[in-house]
Amino acid sequence: MEKPIVLVIMDGVGKGDGGIGDAVVVAKTPTLDHLLATCPHTYLKAHGTAVGLPSDDDMGNSEVGHNALGCGQVYSQGAKLVGESIENGTLYASETWKELVANAEGKAMHFMGLLSDGNVHSNISHLIALLKQAHAEGVKKAYCHILLDGRDVPATSALEYVEQLETVLSELNTEGCDYAIASGGGRMQVTMDRYEANWGMVEKGWRTHVEGLGRQFASAKEAIETYRNETGCIDQDLPAFVVARNGEPVAKINNGDSVILFNFRGDRAQEISLAFDRKDFDKFDRPGYTGVKFAGMLQYDGDLNIPEHYLVQPPVIKNTLTEVLCEAGIHEYALSETQKYGHVTYFWNGNRSGKVCEELEVYEEIPSDVIPFEQAPAMKSAEITEKMVENMASKKFQFLRCNFPNGDMVGHTGVMDAVVYAMECVDNGLKAIIEAADQYGYTVLITADHGNADQMTETKKGKTSVRTAHSLNPVPFIIYDKDHQWVIKEGSYGLANVAPTVVKMMGLTAPECWEDSMI
């Protein structure tokens, strides 16, 4: 092994068009600019089929991105798995689906999840397929608890999806049936917290969906239009709402009902799953709750058994980079703040909690701020940098990885000035890590998991608007080594080529199932 290796993941930093909406270029980033001008580098595909998603129209995300980075292979991912299991009928043949349908006799079936076709956390087509199948199998009452997106899709597109869903529900309202939207709210306000950053969001979702508490409206459309006029918020930030008839909620989630969480992505599905699933749940009070028949679209964490019941078998990712390095006795260090800590650990390790080898691995989490990221766009970049430099100086580890979340988390706010500042903070971190690499003798690899900050605007039909979703742009892969001029082979590469490159640099043998090394 020539040198220990540091991998820096600049979350949400792709190669944009260099225009006024490209915060990566607009920002003053002298370190990144210098690295791109002087170091071996290429650009990696970070979306679509390169990361296991159904088509190249599908934007990448941090989950599938870190899976690919950490396992050196392209696996069929959530959206693709679910789509296949719906098409071939295996979902409806599962014991879990059969139990949910049987249980709904004389009761209600509830569908909860993100309402869009963003294909990052969910897809409305999956919800519609499940609703139609439930109706075909005799379920009389089905209610939707919808979380509004505006993050993986255009910022104010919620009404398009609501209208699409309402059309289907009206078709399913045949004699004796009641199919309706019961509650909802913006995904960054209710239900979809992750990494235990803000349990208050989940509690708000519980009060809204389960207890039917909250401001009432005659329809989801009325709620969205009213809140937009009152608050000026984009979809992801709209407050919670309850749909009512004659002053009463259309549907609460009652004890004994069937409940399906139709999101396929794990990070923002785990907390609400725990609230439904666990008898010993203690994050907030659940007055009168004795339990429902609950299932997730996938199992979101196999090691922690979240949830206990699920409709589609998740990808079992074997032969990860961590497994290869542990087998070789390599000491590893993984670091980020709360918002991306799970990405450099759980997702990196193939959707598994815990460590492969306690003796060889150290994971460190810096708690994230619980304030809007546009108000503090530096996030914890300084603290991440300090910890990385400290651990490089210790020389305890041969492979260190960190994630700077700024480009993605601030990118999602759509506030250009904040994103530009966020990028400058990441560049400051890079500078210190490069200096430490020179001082202590490391090779540094710099990449990203997907784009976001590189495309902050989009133009449709001649109209330019703020973009808050990930981009389809490739991401940089840079090799910095002051003592060795590495040569990147010609070719077309994706995120899954990073792990093989790390192993090659270390002089180790990659598993046969892996993609090729870039060097």
Where are these regions (language model features)?
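Feature captures the catalytic ectodomains and active-site-proximal regions of enzymes
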Residues: 1-519
